[in-house]
Amino acid sequence: MALTVKEEEFSNTLIKNASAFDRLKLGNLKNLKIQKKLQFLYLILFVLITGVFFFFLIGNFYSHRKLYQVIKNTKHTTIGFKIDRPHDKVLSSVLKNKLSTYVKESFKFFKSGYAQKGYLGSENDSIELDDVANLMFYGEGQIGTNKQPFMFIFDTGSANLWVPSVNCDSIGCSTKHLYDASASKSYEKDGTKVEISYGSGTVRGYFSKDVISLGDLSLPYKFIEVTDADDLEPIYSGSEFDGILGLGWKDLSIGSIDPVVVELKKQNKIDNALFTFYLPVHDKHVGYLTIGGIESDFYEGPLTYEKLNHDLYWQIDLDIHFGKYVMQKANAVVDSGTSTITAPTSFLNKFFRDMNVIKVPFLPLYVTTCDNDDLPTLEFHSRNNKYTLEPEFYMDPLSDIDPALCMLYILPVDIDDNTFILGDPFMRKYFTVFDYEKESVGFAVAKNL
């Protein structure tokens, strides 16, 4: 029997089916159109991201350029310095030790109501809050005719200048710039033994005299050569500074020595016995110390002065308002060495509980939600003026932990029952003048350069 196979029977039914073939072509066309639309969207997204990036770069460039021009054109000696922020180290440690979940879950737990409402820490917490409150302004200076370089902490809370000596055999001194008296022709021997104590420990050594240089200013000055810094460990070894340049008052000094700025004025090296701090809003890791005059381009609006109420510290009288909580005639210390606003514990705990602020157990972190509308503008009233500090200046998002959570730069510190410290958050909003001759502190709103 003959078997006949027709061509149309052999052909693929999909090809034979014209409607199916048409649908296939239509589908390909649709996919092509979708791909083109996606490519177009990707292009738009790329342009937007690139535009935002370049806008940021240009804005940052012009911001730094404005600041550079101010510093370049100022008539007064201005020294840039780095700021070592302890909260950065805490957050870095949290991330390094994978404690992000612990922070988030601690906040949820204490907010849930299953535990003590508004947990604010206990005596069992292992990290001292005083440590995280410490702030360091690092700036360069030189000693001797051969300009031996040192990195100083500019500290308004102390009044002596010290550097480590080549005769220092402490562990921390092994990594520091060491002062060598034999290398300087302007060195004058004193040799009087001395020790000076700080909250973190005591240093020991002896007095010497040599030429101190800060920027384009220089003067013969009596300082301490430190030979023993063991009590400062482990802070000293783990920090960048070599020594401390005290910017406090003579009566606070060991040896009754005039502060560097006062001595510069006595020797007619500067016009006024004052110094100022400008902390840029856009960069929390740098600042500028100006000696001998006031650079008006660092601030805007009026510059107002508050009379000191103490002969040892830059301390003034203020009525302080944390929302409904008020401390009348509080002592307010303006301090470059404090990273936060501090307040007496009993006062601050009431405020924190009302504001739904929680302390993370065993960590020096006080946190709340970033959208916490209960947080008020802090107010500081003098007899004639009012200074304010909005939440944006005293809180920051914990972006790498939980973007919904913010930490507060307000800490409980008990100097006594009515003393507050106005540290970095306050000085970042307000350009600050420390005036020895007027025995006053001046404030003006800092420009965002």
From Swiss-Prot:
Pro-sequence residue ranges: 1-121
Active site: D155, D335
PTM field: Proteolytically cleaved into the soluble active mature form by cysteine proteases in the digestive vacuole of trophozoites. Proteolysis requires an acidic environment. Autoprocessing or transprocessing by other plasmepsins such as PMII may serve as an alternate activation system.
Superkingdom, taxonomy of origin: Eukaryota
Alphabetically ordered keywords of this record: Aspartyl protease, Disulfide bond, Hydrolase, Membrane, Protease, Signal-anchor, Transmembrane, Transmembrane helix, Vacuole, Zymogen
A GO-annotated cellular component: food vacuole
Disruption phenotype: Quadruple knockout of PMI, PMII, PMIII and PMIV causes a decrease in proliferation, an impaired proliferation in an amino acid-limited medium, a reduced formation of haemozoin and an abnormal accumulation of endosomal vesicles inside the digestive vacuole.
Gene3D superfamilies found in the cross-reference section: Acid Proteases
Any one GO MF annotation of this record: aspartic-type endopeptidase activity
Residues exposed to the Cytoplasmic side: 1-37
Biological process according to GO: acquisition of nutrients from host; hemoglobin catabolic process; proteolysis
Reaction(s) the record says it catalyses: Hydrolysis of the bonds linking certain hydrophobic residues in hemoglobin or globin. Also cleaves small molecules substrates such as Ala-Leu-Glu-Arg-Thr-Phe-|-Phe(NO2)-Ser-Phe-Pro-Thr
Subunit structure: Component of the hemozoin formation complex (HFC) composed of falcipains FP2A and/or FP2B, plasmepsins PMII, PMIII/HAP and PMIV, heme detoxifying protein HDP and falcilysin FLN. The HFC complex is involved in hemoglobin degradation and detoxification of heme in the food vacuole during the asexual blood stage.
Record-given protein name: Plasmepsin IV
Lineage: Eukaryota, Sar, Alveolata, Apicomplexa, Aconoidasida
